[in-house]
Amino acid sequence: MSGSKGVWGAPPGNNNRQLYSLDAGSSGSGVSASSAQRHSILDPHDSVMDLLNGQQSCAFDSRLIQNQDLIDRKGKSNNIDHNDINTHTHSKGLTDSWQAIDRDEYSFLNAGNHNNYHNTSNGDFNQQFGGVLSSDTSEEEVEINAAPSPNLSASQQHNQFLAYPLSSTGFGDQGNSETTVHQFSDGDPVKSTKTGQFSKAELGAGTGEDETIMVNLGHSWAGSFFVMPKLSLSESMKRFKILILSDGDSANSFYNRLSRYHRLMFDVGKLNEASKEEALKYTAFMIIFSDSKKVTTILNRMWKKYGDFTLIPICQKGQKQSVTEKVKTFANSNKIKLMSYPVVISDHYEIHGLLRHLHSLYVEVDSDYETDIPKKTKPRKGAKKKPAPHLAKRWWFWPISIALGVGIGCCVTFYFSKFETSSYNSSVGVIQTADKEIDAIVDAIEGNSPSILEESSPQSISDFLGQVCKLVKDTAIQINELLKQFLSAHLMTSAWIQSIGKEFMQPDSQSTISKVTALDLVMF
């Protein structure tokens, strides 16, 4: 063991610092750190230390003798008392217990450098290995000092540590192969240049009190992560906003005429003053054209600066037709998108309709749902329609009703025409009677022979009902004869043959006529 080895943060030739100090601060912190570690409830292996020491007594005694020799050589220069020596030997047992049980679990801490890492406080270690879990799904940023990502498993962290060793700002290799220099940076400028040099041959692989401290810090590193959402203020939510532009003061005057209810949708600006980044925040541009001749120039200039955009054109009185034609030309070339057709600024009715349409869009976009909800009107009590009768729903009801009505009308007409004919025939028969019959009728009318009238008049009600029944019977017979005459006149065999055509006629006309006659009989 050579006594020329460098110590933590000490300049060449100055060996007044402690070699086994657990903190980069004062020399008296070693006892407190070791006692806190020995009696800490976070150390699960303190209770089994005696069992492990019994099995590893041989190896422990040999290492203890070497450490005692090293301490005796540097005891005078470093002013190490016996309490620190006992504390170090007891911590040495804790180190062996850790290495015997959970060495593989924290192997990634020593994968880059086989040397031990000394004099790192808890804040410095978290600065090197700390990380933040974020709910953002964007691409992960490169961690400072190539810290392992907390989203990786233990095996993936080990592979990442081997592939990308820590940079020189955290742990760097300096000097020859026998000596390794570890640099740690903290917020204090006084302690920013702390370095430590230890020989691999002096400390050995996987031994030393400082390795136990690193393992304990690994526990705190594993439990120090917290979840914080990653908020981005560069890209805020795009809302419904319209920028009013004009080449004069028309935009300000138009904005001042609006009510406070509608001013929330608009901002005022001048042509070509808004940058391209600011223009992306607006839904559309409302341009007030003072002259129809400048429409093409203004739109070309804005298209070259902002690209395709949404336009709400406002024109002056008498220029609506020319502005409409020029705006449609740009819309057909896919340079602009029209939110509305040109509106005359002096027409209050058109301006009011435009503002009402824009406000409905503003409310719809701001609330993220459709505002036009169909209203359900309750039917009035008196507005209920009466259900149609069951017979009216049948298609065959109306044809039959019409046929019966026409038939009854024909029957009544035929009856009255027949009654007029019978009365005319009876009057002619009376004229042709004999003279004695005429005299008898005249006497009966004058009242000279009432017996004749009594015989001709009905004697009782039964005789009257008989005459009525006879009249109904005669009427039915006459209607039957009328129907037969009508059907025979319109549905004759010759008529059927003529309607079919000349091609229906055959050389054997008798058989054809007999078949058609049989068909007529079936129908009748």
UniProtKB/Swiss-Prot annotation:
Topology with respect to the bilayer: Single-pass membrane protein
Parts of the chain that traverse the membrane: 396-416
Region (Disordered): 1-37, 165-196
Domain of life: Eukaryota
Any one biological process term the GO annotation gives: autophagy
Keywords annotated in UniProt: Autophagy, Membrane, Mitochondrion, Mitochondrion outer membrane, Transmembrane, Transmembrane helix, Vacuole
GO cellular component: mitochondrial outer membrane; phagophore assembly site membrane; vacuolar membrane
Residue stretches in coiled coil: none
Location(s), subcellular: Mitochondrion outer membrane; Vacuole membrane; Preautophagosomal structure membrane
Presence of the UniProt keyword Transmembrane helix in the record: yes
Keyword tRNA-binding: no
Polar residues: compositionally biased ranges: 165-183
Compositionally skewed regions (Low complexity) per UniProt: 24-36
Family: Belongs to the ATG32 family.
General function of this protein: Mitophagy-specific receptor that recruits the autophagic machinery to mitochondria and regulates selective degradation of mitochondria. Mitophagy contributes to regulate mitochondrial quantity and quality by eliminating the mitochondria to a basal level to fulfill cellular energy requirements and preventing excess ROS production. Recruits ATG11 to the surface of mitochondria. Also promotes autophagy-dependent peroxisome degradation.
Name of the protein: Autophagy-related protein 32
Native organism: Kluyveromyces lactis (strain ATCC 8585 / CBS 2359 / DSM 70799 / NBRC 1267 / NRRL Y-1140 / WM37) (Yeast)
